[in-house]
Design a protein with these regions (language model features):
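Non-catalytic interface/linker regions that flank or bridge core catalytic/transmembrane domains
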Residues: 1-87
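Tryptophan-centered motif/residue detector
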Residues: 22-25, 90-93, 130, 206
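A generic structural signal for ordered alpha-helices
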Residues: 34-37, 70, 74, 96-100, ...
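Residues that form generic nucleotide/phosphate-binding pockets
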Residues: 59-62, 78-82, 92-99, 215, ...
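N-proximal short alpha-helices
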Residues: 62-65, 69, 87-91, 105, ...
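Alpha-helix initiation and N-capping motif
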Residues: 72, 86-93, 221, 253
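Active-site flanking loop/helix segments enriched in acidic
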Residues: 77-113, 194-199
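Divalent metal-dependent catalytic cores for phosphoryl transfer on phosphate-bearing substrates
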Residues: 107-270
Length: 270
């Protein structure tokens, strides 16, 4: 199935009212009582007038339907040549400022403000400079929107492709629409991988995590790279799924991702 040849409607390209809508859904699913947002309880987040969250559900229907093993390979081949556009970092930050929508009920913050708050919270807690930089850059991969990429190919919980899907991934029922679900090469426990092969050998669904990791992989320590590459892989670091693909080094390194996750989720402050 050649997903890049498929034509999507405007609604299918942008099912969410804003990219923050996905992040707020994650916040609702994974609250941490010991981390408080200033003047706002966890129960107050995601206060939409329509409680059905139809846009988030539609977003995941599209994400789980079209994020196939072949789709991920195609996107890597397309975008990891880094031949699309060149811009200074501050221009990229200015672009991220456009990725906010008045329909987001939780905050009027743009994406750049979220990055500033994340990095400042990390600095305030005395973490090393490389981690502060990681916080500042962790969502920079959302510049994929510059290239008219569908939202579901930029944000969303990430997961391994090329093997069976975990039922702990949000809205797992939508994977039945994915052609890999019935492909015997991809729908077994290990799929195209070997037991404990290590995440470096596993393809993860395509989006901003992988893109910014590939951009920065030669510039920050490995601990920060784990934070970048897997910060949306909630089925692993919140649910403990796909442990059979991990090697000992993955298990050791994830403690750094665990340190980063609260800053990503809970630093957002209006």
């Amino acid at each position: 199935m050649q997903n890049q040849q498929q034509t999507f409607s405007a609604k299918e390209i942008n099912p969410l009212q804003s990219l923050d809508e996905w992040e707020d859904d994650v916040l609702e699913r994974y609250p941490e009582p010991d981390v408080k947002a200033k003047d706002k309880s966890k129960e107050e987040f995601r206060n939409y007038e329509t409680p059905g969250r139809d846009t988030v559900k539609e977003f995941y229907r599209l994400n789980h339907t079209y994020q196939t093993y072949d789709f991920v390979k195609e996107k890597k081949n397309n975008f990891l040549q880094f031949d699309k556009k060149e811009m200074p970092v501050w221009d990229a930050f200015n672009f991220l400022n456009q990725l906010v929508d008045d329909s987001d009920p939780d905050t009027d913050l743009d994406q750049f403000q979220h990055l500033l708050q994340t990095s400042e919270a990390i600095r305030r807690d005395g973490h090393p400079d490389w981690m502060v930089l990681t916080g500042l850059m962790h969502d920079m991969g959302k510049v994929l929107c510059l290239f008219d990429e569908p939202q579901w190919a930029v944000v969303g919980d990430t997961f391994p492709v090329g093997c069976a899907y975990s039922d702990k991934i949000v809205y797992p029922e939508f994977f039945k629409n994915n052609p890999d679900y019935v492909n015997p090469d991809y729908n077994t426990k290990y799929g195209v991988y070997e037991k404990e092969c290590g995440l470096r050998n596993v393809d993860i669904s395509w989006g901003h995590d992988e893109y910014i990791y590939q951009i920065l992989k030669d510039y920050i320590p490995e601990e920060g790279l784990y934070m970048l590459r897997y910060h949306s892989f909630y089925a692993w670091h919140r649910e403990g799924e796909n442990s059979y693909l991990l090697d000992d080094h993955n298990r050791e390194m994830w403690k750094w991702g665990k340190r980063f996750n609260p800053y990503d989720l809970y630093a957002k402050n209006p």
